[in-house]
A protein has these predicted regions:
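N-terminal, active-site-proximal structural segment of metallo-dependent hydrolase catalytic domains
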Residues: 2-54, 60, 64
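Beta-strand-turn-beta hairpins that frame and shape the catalytic cleft
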Residues: 13-22, 159-168, 189
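Short, glycine-anchored, charge-dense loop/turn motifs used at functional sites
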Residues: 22, 119-127, 242-250
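Cys-nucleophile CN-hydrolase/nitrilase-fold catalytic domain and related Cys-dependent amidase chemistry
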Residues: 33, 42-123, 197-218
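Short beta->alpha transition motifs characteristic of CBS
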Residues: 63, 69, 118, 129-136, ...
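Active-site catalytic loop in hydrolytic enzyme cores
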Residues: 76, 108-185, 198-207, 270-277
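CN hydrolase (nitrilase-like) catalytic-core segments centered on the catalytic cysteine
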Residues: 78-99, 166, 172-259
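Short beta-strand scaffold segments in enzyme catalytic cores
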Residues: 100-102, 116-119, 158-160, 239-241, ...
Length: 285
């Protein structure tokens, strides 16, 4: 499969002084879209009231069904549907950029959807969409996951020019593939909305997030599902924000809530000047 790159450009004004508050939402979503949207609205308000200008929801925030096929039934066409209407209206109402960790978007393949990360600006406009490229598969004891049975993989690396710098979009299992982030170029912020299992999360989650931040000298915001779900699945949680030096700025081990921190682009630039690792890269073929 050929992977392409795309950058979405925004006309928004850059944030003054290079400092902005960013927030991640942690949830334990269930099979009711209405209930999940209500919880997301509550948590987005908390983040906005604390001064966040960018709020990122976890993977599958709108539906964690009893069966994998539940998300296929809940899939929407791009540009319409209750989930997207909620995201647009809430971004405008709260005057924040909202990144919908992922929602199911209809595909051309019967019985399958795209697992799509949708980015809305503070006017409620959809400015970018990323379809998850790497589909999770696990066969470990009693745990078996095969996302490819209901999801069509994406084929584009997506970045967004925003008031908060250049943002790279990814979802959950993508975190294990550093070449994806290298393909983004020099981004200021990587987003990794996730639903890591408890098994893989407790073993690898923090290590992977901090590694991506350090090797790319950028901020990483990783909001996650955290708790027990109607399917019997347990997700790891531990949503976190990590700075370009690998320091964890905020984290939430379990349950619903918000992580929030200030992103300082001047600090990031100083680190990249002191340790110019990005300019020292050698690309091997």
């Amino acid at each position: 499969m050929a992977i392409k790159s795309r950058t979405n450009h925004s006309k928004a004004t850059p944030t003054a002084a290079g400092i902005v508050k960013i927030a991640g939402i942690q949830m334990a979503s269930g099979p009711s879209v209405a209930a999940n949207l209500s919880e997301a609205e509550r948590l987005i308000k908390i983040a906005a009231d604390q001064g966040a200008k960018l709020v990122v929801l976890p993977e599958y925030f709108a539906i964690m069904g009893v069966k994998d096929t539940d998300k296929v039934k809940a899939a929407e066409q791009e540009g319409s549907g209750q989930i997207q209407q909620f995201l647009s209206a809430t971004a405008k109402k709260r005057d924040v950029w909202i990144v919908a960790g992922s929602i199911p978007i209809q595909s051309e393949t019967k019985g399958k959807v795209y697992n799509a990360c949708m980015v809305y600006d503070n006017k409620g406009k959809l400015v970018a969409r990323y379809n998850k490229i790497h589909l999770f598969g696990l066969n470990l004891g009693n745990e078996k996951y095969h996302e490819e049975s209901t999801i069509v993989p994406g084929n584009q690396v997506v970045t967004v020019d925003s008031p908060f710098g250049k943002i790279g979009l990814s979802i959950c299992y993508d975190l294990r593939f550093p070449e994806l982030y290298r393909a983004m170029g020099n981004v200021d912020l990587i987003l990794v909305p996730s639903a890591f299992t408890e098994t893989t999360g407790k073993a690898h989650w923090e290590t992977l997030i901090r590694a991506r931040a350090i090797e790319n000298l950028c901020y990483v915001l990783a909001p996650a599902q955290g708790g027990y779900h109607a399917s019997g699945r347990e997700t790891h949680g531990d949503s976190m924000i990590v700075d370009p030096w690998g320091v964890v700025l905020d984290r939430l081990p379990r349950g619903s809530g918000v992580v929030i921190a200030s992103m300082n682009l001047d600090y990031q630039a100083s680190l990249r000047k002191s340790l110019p690792a990005l300019t020292h890269r050698t690309v091997f073929k």
